[in-house]
């Protein structure tokens, strides 16, 4: 008898848990509860075939165009590509897309709004003029979940776009530093060449001694002075250029470090599901 009671108790607990799972997940929810829980509206709009249809609708506080591009990016990632339809809708036709339905379907989306907010209208069809609305509990629940998941997709789309822009800025700074490093190497090479010229010139120039001081070729001395002046001017100019480019490198490396910090902090804001 105790064994029977124990089995009955376990069975009762299991059934209770099963009922709770069903209640929070699928069949024990009515469409009105689903729509309220997921903050979904049902709207009448002029549909893709120029007929009045009821759509699942949700508004997001992001630019409408951003929302549209985020949806297309998600669908492309899932292997689906859209076609333009009437009244601002785009569609995926004749596809198997389990998030919305377990069989072949067509689904249509349009996004309306402004720079401040956008509303997504979702229409699901299992055949010509066979549109599914909130009276179909499974379709209602699937649509509600899908529209709710879009919040993450939009955030991720914005995040990745921002990250791409910052990475592009970083790449530009790295390219600038590479150019400056090449300029620095060229200047240093010219400085080496200038130093060799000065060394060679000093070795060949007239040396003043007691024996030749009275019979020097003054014109040659003047030419040597002019050559010496040019070599020194070149040396000074090259050293100035080197200092300038090294300063530019220092500034660019500072910007690079700042940009890397910007990217690091941005990555910390990656949206979580």
Which residues are covered by each model-predicted region?
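Structured segments of extracytoplasmic/periplasmic soluble domains
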Residues: 70-81, 149-153, 157, 197, ...
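N-terminal, leucine/charged-rich tether regions that mediate assembly and partner docking
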Residues: 20-128
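Leucine-rich amphipathic alpha-helices with coiled-coil/heptad-repeat character
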Residues: 184, 191, 198, 205, ...
């Amino acid at each position: 008898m105790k064994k029977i009671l124990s089995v009955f108790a376990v069975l009762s607990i299991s059934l209770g848990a099963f009922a709770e799972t069903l209640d929070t997940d699928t069949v024990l929810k009515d469409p009105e509860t689903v729509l309220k829980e997921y903050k979904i509206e049902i709207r009448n709009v002029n549909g893709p075939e120029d007929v009045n249809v009821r759509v699942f609708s949700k508004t997001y506080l992001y630019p409408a165009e951003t929302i549209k591009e985020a949806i297309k990016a998600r669908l492309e990632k899932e292997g689906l590509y859209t076609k333009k339809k009437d009244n601002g809708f785009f569609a995926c036709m004749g596809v198997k897309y389990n998030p919305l339905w377990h069989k072949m379907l067509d689904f249509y989306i349009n996004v309306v709004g402004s720079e401040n907010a956008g509303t997504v209208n979702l229409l699901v069809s299992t055949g010509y003029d066979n549109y599914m609305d909130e009276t179909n509990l499974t379709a209602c629940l699937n649509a509600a979940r899908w529209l709710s998941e879009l919040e993450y997709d939009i955030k991720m789309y914005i995040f990745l776009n921002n990250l791409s822009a910052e990475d592009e800025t970083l790449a530009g700074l790295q390219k600038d530093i590479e150019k400056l490093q090449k300029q620095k190497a060229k200047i240093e090479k010219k400085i080496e060449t200038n130093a060799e010229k000065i060394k060679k010139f000093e070795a060949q120039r007239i040396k003043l001694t007691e024996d030749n001081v009275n019979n020097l070729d003054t014109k040659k001395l003047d030419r040597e002075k002019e050559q010496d002046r040019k070599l020194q001017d070149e040396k000074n100019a090259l050293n100035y250029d080197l200092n300038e480019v090294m300063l530019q490198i220092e500034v660019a490396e500072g910007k690079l470090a700042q940009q890397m910090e910007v990217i690091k902090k941005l990555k910390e804001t990656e949206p979580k599901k």
